[in-house]
Amino acid sequence: MAKARSGAAGLGLKLFLLLPLLGEAPLGLYFSRDAYWERLYVDQPAGTPLLYVHALRDAPGEVPSFRLGQYLYGVYRTRLHENDWIHIDSGTGLLYLNQSLDHSSWEQLSIRNGGFPLLTVFLQVFLGSTAQREGECHWPGCARVYFSFINDTFPNCSSFKARDLCTPETGVSFRIRENRPPGTFYQFRMLPVQFLCPNISVKYKLLEGDGLPFRCDPDCLEVSTRWALDRELQEKYVLEAECAVAGPGANKEKVAVSFPVTVYDEDDSPPTFSGGVGTASAVVEFKRKEGTVVATLQVFDADVVPASGELVRRYTSTLLSGDSWAQQTFRVEHTPNETLVQSNNNSVRATMHNYKLVLNRSLSISESRVLQLVVLVNDSDFQGPGSGVLFLHFNVSVLPVTLNLPMAYSFPVNRRARRYAQIGKVCVENCQEFSGVSIQYKLQPSSTNCSALGVVTSTEDTSGTLYVNDTEALRRPECTELQYTVVATDRQTRRQTQASLVVTVEGTYIAEEVGCPKSCAVNKRRPECEECGGLGSPTGRCEWRQGDGKGITRNFSTCSPSTRTCPDGHCDALESRDINICPQDCLRGPIVGGHERGERQGIKAGYGICNCFPDEKKCFCEPEDSQGPLCDELCRTVITAAVLFSFIISVLLSTFCIHRYHKHAHKPPIASAEMTFCRPAQGFPISYSSSGTRRPSLDSMENQVSVDSFKIPEDPKWEFPRKNLVLGKTLGEGEFGKVVKATAFRLKGRAGYTTVAVKMLKENASQSELRDLLSEFNLLKQVNHPHVIKLYGACSQDGPLLLIVEYAKYGSLRGFLRDSRKIGPAYVSSGGSRNSSSLDHPDERVLTMGDLISFAWQISRGMQYLAEMKLVHRDLAARNILVAEGRKMKISDFGLSRDVYEEDSYVKKSKGRIPVKWMAIESLFDHIYTTQSDVWSFGVLLWEIVTLGGNPYPGIPPERLFNLLKTGHRMERPDNCSEEMYRLMLQCWKQEPDKRPVFADISKDLEKMMVKSRDYLDLAASTPSDSLLYDDGLSEEETPLVDCNSAPLPRSLPSTWIENKLYGMSDPNWPGESPVPLTRADGTSTGFPRYANDSVYANWMVSPSAAKLMDTFDS
């Protein structure tokens, strides 16, 4: 009896322990949907059926039991109201309205929703006594039912459309587990419509249902499965149904309804060997680095990839080995990949598991072993028949590595090679395949005197790169062959091997061009790239890589030390030693313009031309300036014909003019349009015809007459009434001319008075000076540019000739810059606020570097305009640039009255004078003046601007300057001058004119500098303390203006005629020819016009008849 009692007690305890399990049995049931949708209306009657929720069985015999959550929630899971409006039949899953809702119910929910109109609420439906708590709803044991509240009464039944009666507003989809008993998962009927509109008939028919595992009951319209589904056969179904709607007195309508069914997977397929292969063999030899994959085996599983959280628990892989060395050296990595397989013409998801045998540590080159490794794979959740365990076999052989070098290496090297130039590579056998092996290379020179190379080890391919380490040794004549011993050492085992190396030195050393940058990447244009060298250049010259011009591309245009190695998208061990070698691959700074950055550094792809400034740690990728040919062959033919026709017309017109000239009386000639600053030192002025031959001007054929008797033709377009002009104080004067400040009444139709400047001759001026003034008058009538001094008019009748030009408030640029130094070093940063005085008087604020660049840019724009007009200035300098209000630059000095704002600069002595320190080298030696010689002068002008009006070549007399320029000497970079600005100066001072930039390119470069300029110029720091730079007591105002002898200069004189003639200097070592390869007048023409008259506007003297004709054209 006691035993019976104790047995009964034990049974009771077991039953007590099983009670929770029995209570949880309905949890095997699951909802066929995770969300349901329905509408609720105001005054909808109580008892209205809303919808059915369905549960499917996980095992036979399970009976569903439904319950609702306690509260209604807002869409943001806000608890709004206790649920007493909607009830559910726990057995059938039917939800119905427990009470009618009115407008107050709507308002009550809206108030609890924070005053916002409420549109949607949801409640939770649970299966049985699920352990999920209120507010925690997760499929498959819980589903949400969303209700859209409509603040209106139920619509009239006749207003419904057929689709609204057939299917819910939101689509429906279903989830059914495989291998589960069949059951009902949906009911077609729209219950509220059926309840409130009984006269409307809605019937459904499942299409093509015979071949599918689904059926629809024609009476209750319930959709259920016919048999258990198998996901491995078909994973997705799309059911099609036909809905027929019929109402009283209405035609029958049919609507197609579709809804998807997804079959959920369970682990019912065992793992198998992919392709039936369960063994892999591997050899470990050159790849010995930790993480190296030794071998891979694949395992196929027809089930889907488990969730990441389940993967580690479900699939386990264990390395079975009693060898501790193997356990430490190898590990197994498991990676599942989803794949698709075909089953009954359907694509079904499956899983391919990759098991990789990986080195857990790096192996030395001396390690040698042979072993077999077994890996156990276990699918722990497998529920089907058979086994979920597999054994993978790996046969591994670890072989030792022997270091060997070739018998000997031989490379050439150019004597002009720059430092870090790559000469070649050394590499032990199979080094390209090495991984995890660390090799160090060293060079042992046979002679220390001729040791010019170094070696650096590449971390990528374990090779050694030979490079130039000492350029001085390469230049020694005795160093014709460099001999070394290459030693390769394994860092871990210290094993070594060696080979001989012979390097032959070739070529002849040529000195570097003056002003070349340290890095080839700085150069943006091909000519300056190929004439300079840079770090890493094997030939001593940079190489230009021309891009394909196809948008942002890896093949962008750039300047490189060697296109074989740079840029290649990879910053190697040698390039990383100095950023100047190949910043295109190694720069980590910002890249401006269209580009694609490399993974860690450099430019992967760029747009147009990419150039870099390593010192500033910036690169720029910008469109190429040069475009494709604008004119094809037909176009060129038409232009040639037009030019030929124009030439014939010109010849006929010239013949007619000459004939009229000899037929009629002489009239005063029209002055030259050349911007001359000093007549050629000859007995009479020389003019050049379009053919380039000399002919005497009218000065040599006419007697000298007084200025007063010189009759000037009136030009009605430009004539200004003399009585309306009131002259004021003198602004500046020379020996024969002066400029005064004046006011003009009703100038150009303006009301009131306008402040102007008036140019005029002094009483002692001759006809030659008058011709100069007339020359400037005729020239200014033809130019119109915001940065060229503007002509307003002239008083040419009934008195001396007066030219009325634009008034420049601040005088010459040189004086303006020097006065700015008196403001003092105080300045405000870009982030600070300016004081009130600088805001009221913006022209008086302290200069910034951006202002100085803006001055240079304005002048370059004006010179670009003059160059396009085929005009040569010949005296471009800061003293001849005027500063108008608003700090606007005005190019001036086109004739006699040049530099009258700088009183003592051009005071004419007994002889003419020329500005030596501003003149191009070909102008000094060959008396040749072109637009490119103006570019040279512009470079000196840049130097004046940056130094705030400093004197060029301070302390250097002109007689020394000639030899210095011939030997390549150029002014050094001022302290406050940026590298980019100084490079532009050096480009302007190129010895060959055709290698200097044109003004259009100069303007573009200055525009970019203006964009990048941000800092204010510190006048205290930027003003040099050297008194030579600004001391006028050294007569620098006179020194640069060299006297021109009045005697004729025969073209047979040597190129140093200025030195010999002016200073009586001679030197037997001076060359007899000019250092500039320019052709003289008796040879072939140069690439640029020698004077302005070689182009459109000429220094030509015309006959009176032709002058009259030109006056007619002008007016």
Swiss-Prot record:
It catalyses: L-tyrosyl-[protein] + ATP = O-phospho-L-tyrosyl-[protein] + ADP + H(+). The record marks 708-709, 1018-1019 as: Cleavage. Its cofactor is Ca(2+). GO terms for cellular component: axon; dendrite; early endosome; endosome membrane; neuronal cell body; plasma membrane; plasma membrane protein complex; receptor complex. PROSITE patterns: CADHERIN_2, PROTEIN_KINASE_ATP, PROTEIN_KINASE_DOM, PROTEIN_KINASE_TYR. Residues 168-273 form the Cadherin domain. It is an enzyme of class 2 (transferase). It comes from the Eukaryota. It holds the Pfam family RET_CRD. Expressed in neurons and kidney glomeruli podocytes (at protein level). Detected at least in colon, duodenum, adipose tissue, heart, jejenum, lung, muscle, spleen, stomac, testis and thymus. Residues 29-153 are annotated as: Cadherin-like region 1 (CLD1). One of its GO terms (biological process) is positive regulation of neuron maturation. Receptor tyrosine-protein kinase involved in numerous cellular mechanisms including cell proliferation, neuronal navigation, cell migration, and cell differentiation in response to glia cell line-derived growth family factors (GDNF, NRTN, ARTN, PSPN and GDF15). In contrast to most receptor tyrosine kinases, RET requires not only its cognate ligands but also coreceptors, for activation. This is Proto-oncogene tyrosine-protein kinase receptor Ret.
